[in-house]
A protein has these predicted regions:
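A short coil-to-beta-strand element that immediately follows conserved catalytic motifs
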Residues: 91-101
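Conserved Nudix-box catalytic region and its N-terminal flanking loop in Nudix hydrolases
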Residues: 45-86
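NUDIX/MutT-family hydrolases
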Residues: 119-121, 130-152
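Acidic, metal-coordinating catalytic segment for phosphate/diphosphate chemistry
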Residues: 2-36
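Active-site-adjacent beta-strand/loop module that shapes the phosphate/pyrophosphate-binding cleft
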Residues: 43-45, 101-129, 141
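Short connector loops at helix/strand junctions that flank enzyme active sites
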Residues: 32, 60-65, 94-96, 113-117, ...
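Conserved beta-strand and immediately adjacent loop positions that scaffold enzyme active sites
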Residues: 36, 46, 139
Length: 152
């Protein structure tokens, strides 16, 4: 058996230029945290919706739930309470919110690294809905749930 193998002592693995670059460590938040609230009046079977204005950053003219971004370190239930009040003037208690749905998106208008939206349902609130952000919303109103499509 020979003592010297060919290329003995030379490195076998060699770096090539066609390797994909290593991913950079994530320094910023990977996910934007968002809260939305379905205010549902079960006695009249209506929910509060906002129509986005022509000045809105996206989805102009479309109908939406009261929704908004979480502040750093803010509990998501507090985000829901704050955004609902800022947009509609309605007040809910954090403990009365129930998780209705969670949406994860890989990309969003203000979330190029993805977003997570927690949709809450509220059946108890105080106040009457009003358009508190007319630059962002054309109108705020109660909408009968019978008007919603039943399938997508």
């Amino acid at each position: 058996m020979p003592n010297n193998l060919p290329d003995e002592g030379n490195p076998v693995a060699q770096q090539t230029d066609n390797r994909p670059p290593a991913l950079k460590p994530a320094l910023d938040s990977m996910t934007l945290l968002v809260a939305a609230v379905i205010v549902h009046d079960k006695t009249t079977n209506r929910v509060v919706l906002l129509q986005r204005s022509e000045n809105a950053k996206f989805a102009q003219g479309m109908w939406d739930l009261p929704v908004g971004k979480s502040e750093p370190g803010e509990p998501i239930t507090e985000t829901a309470v704050r955004e609902l009040y800022e947009e509609t003037g309605l007040t809910v208690k954090p403990e009365s919110l129930k998780v209705a749905h969670v949406i994860h998106g890989a990309w969003g208008v203000e979330a190029p690294n993805g977003f997570l939206t927690v949709v809450f349902a509220a059946e108890e609130w105080t106040g009457e809905p009003e358009n508190r952000e007319p630059r962002k919303h054309a109108q705020v109103r109660w909408v009968d749930t019978e008007l919603f499509p039943t399938s997508a």
